[in-house]
A protein has these predicted regions:
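NAD(P)+-binding Rossmann beta1-loop-alpha1 motif at the extreme N-terminus of oxidoreductases
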Residues: 1-61
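Conserved active-site and cofactor/substrate-binding residues in soluble primary-metabolism enzymes
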Residues: 7, 11, 15, 35, ...
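Rossmann-like NAD(P)(H) cofactor-binding subdomain of soluble oxidoreductases
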Residues: 53-55, 60-141, 160
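Rossmann-fold dinucleotide-binding core
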Residues: 106-201
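Catalytic phosphate-donor-binding core of small-molecule kinases
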Residues: 140-149, 153-164, 168, 205, ...
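Active-site-proximal catalytic alpha-helix in oxidoreductases
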Residues: 142-147, 176-221, 232-249
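NAD(P)-dependent Rossmann-like dehydrogenase/reductase catalytic/cofactor-binding core
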Residues: 192-193, 221-231, 235-322
Length: 322
């Protein structure tokens, strides 16, 4: 029997676990928190205030115990922690174990995460799963569509693991474009939240989303991905969801900045992603004004309206420059 391990006991990890349960397979959750592991083992796996959610997942805190015998490992922890699990995966799993990245962002030097894993693990069975998906809706079995990028074996494995009449899985061979699109949607969501918080109107939000998509496409192509990926589930799909809803942490953070409101959740991936994206863009001589705007948004005493005006006062140009 195949053993599925999900690294990360947060909302997204448990949401993916709930989808695996639909296939009559019990996934194992690896978490660093003994309390969280205990909660999951006692059916309290949901991070949401919903007593109807009872997931029969198994969890533990010892990498060796959880990872040994795994045929699939899904990384669903914060992107900053993903690379810290490379050694454990290498030590306690078969060298051909499939590894799926469900976290969104860049490495600490702007690297593309799945490419780092391929190199460090000496394993070609690396994939990325992405797309428009709030964890709560996946857990509640609301219709959702995701894309998995990888080789044919990864696509088949992931489809067998997750695909149902509530969770559709589409395949892609573009690991680079899928990974970058997932990181960039958080960047554009922050910008969209700021525009919304400044009451600049729906026209402006539509413009931010569309031009943010153009910036993403530029970066994807520049780093070796496929232009078309940006117009799929990992790109426009996820970007639209995250840029138009207060359920998105990154959108909510941008909105809170604009309104000068306190923000409790410190997991805002888009700020770091913006800085890593600009690092890559500068190497490639790419223009990414919205992304660059997001890099400075957390500076003290910054007037966001003035920064938006700077973007609007840029010289006119063609919509698409190849």
């Amino acid at each position: 029997m195949n053993k599925t391990v999900i690294i990360g006991g947060g909302a997204w990890g448990c949401a993916l676990g709930s989808a695996v349960l639909e296939k009559k397979t019990t996934p194992f959750i690896l978490t660093s928190s003994p309390k969280r592991a205990n909660d999951i083992n006692n059916g309290k796996s949901s991070r949401f205030d919903d007593n109807d959610i009872q997931l029969k997942l198994k969890a533990g805190t010892k990498p060796k115990d959880i990872l040994e015998g795994a045929s699939v490992v899904i990384l669903a922890t914060e992107v900053d922690r993903v690379l810290s699990f490379i050694k454990a995966i290498k030590d306690f799993t078969n060298k051909n174990c499939a590894v799926l990245i469900a976290s969104k962002g860049f490495g600490n030097k702007g690297e593309i995460i799945p490419l780092i894993l391929k190199e460090k693990l000496k394993n070609d069975n690396i994939g990325v799963i992405s797309g428009p998906s709030f964890a709560y809706e996946v857990i509640k079995k609301k219709p959702t569509a995701l894309v998995v990028a990888g080789n044919k074996d990864i696509i088949k494995l992931t489809t067998d693991l997750f695909h149902s009449n509530k969770l559709r899985i589409y395949g892609s061979e573009d690991i680079i474009g899928t990974s970058i699109s997932g990181a960039m949607k958080n960047v554009i969501a922050i910008a969209s939240g700021i525009v919304y918080g400044l009451n600049l109107g729906e026209n402006a939000r539509a413009a931010i989303l569309t031009r943010g998509l153009a910036e993403t496409a530029r970066l994807v192509e520049g780093l070796g991905g496929n232009f078309e990926t940006v117009f799929g589930l990992a790109g426009i799909g996820d970007m639209a969801l995250s840029s138009l809803s207060m359920t998105s942490r990154n959108f909510a953070w941008g909105y809170s900045l604009a309104k000068k409101l306190p923000f409790k959740n410190n997991l805002v991936e888009g700020l770091k992603a913006s800085k890593m994206a600009i690092k890559n863009a500068e190497k490639l001589n790419l223009e990414m004004p919205i992304t660059r705007f997001v890099t400075v948004t957390n500076q003290d005493n910054l007037d966001l309206k003035i920064e938006v005006e700077k973007m609007l006062n840029r010289p006119p140009k063609l919509e698409w420059i190849k």
